[in-house]
From Swiss-Prot:
Residues 244-295 are annotated as: Disordered. Residues 266-278 have a biased composition (Basic and acidic residues). It comes from Xenopus laevis (African clawed frog). PANTHER family: PROTEIN FAM221A (PTHR31214:SF2), PROTEIN FAM221A-RELATED (PTHR31214). It comes from the Eukaryota. Belongs to the FAM221 family. This is Protein FAM221A.
Amino acid sequence: MEKLQFQGGDRAVDEYAEYRRIVGDDDGGKLFTPEEYEQYKKTVLPMRLQNRLYVSWRSPCGMDCKLVGPETACFCTHRYKQHKTDFKELPKERPVLLPCKVSKCPCKSFHYIPLNGSRPIRCRCKHFADEHSLAGTYHCTKCTKCSGFHSSFTCGCGQPAYAHDTIVETKEERLAQGKPVGHDVPYASMGGLTGFSSLAEGYMRLDASGTGAPGASFLESSQSGASHPFLKMYDMPCTVQGVSEPPGIDKQVSSMRLSEEDDMAYFERRYQERLRKEKEHKRQKNSKPPTTQRP
């Protein structure tokens, strides 16, 4: 069989990928001509560079647990890129509504809903999210007792899903909160993505949109059985005036796995050690004499 070779094939693939990132589904499935493509870029790119909207799923503590991107699914099961994201002028009303552009979809605004693995999360009525209506309070279509979608699914930040909100904000509003905005890009429906770290969940993201970089007080804190796993993993011997000190014998013995121990016995022993240390710390705290004030 004769092998076909095309000159500049890799370049054509890159150009098509760039075209699809910029145009998205605005061409209706039919590729723009070169003239239409240039006219489209002249019309749309200034809007995206000046009026970009950042979309995130935010916890009560202010952490962006999820930064919405083009492929992020809405409550209506359609992607973020299938919603209205380009505005000639930014709306003054708050919250900003991003209606779905899919024909006959009643979704009035993008509303992020997390997944439990690959499946939708359940409401307190025991039915899945996609079994609820898109109108009003998202009442259930399978039962009459549900007054609206309300899920106790726990996010990685420790807060339930119902305590989170889908936030749509401008670049200025985001900068005022000290959150990253990234570079101005011409691509469609970028939402809250500002870099590669935006793909991680908020509690794992060491920037201003997530947990943030740990401070010196955290990194230099003394370690015990209840220390953060990060400190245990990257534990370094402490230094005093440039002389390194070996770790304590008790810590070495505690962290050493005995040959006859299985995994459960090892972790149970460490857990009991931590409980004893907490009780001892509480006993010392309560045994301190109260401070008396002189009359």
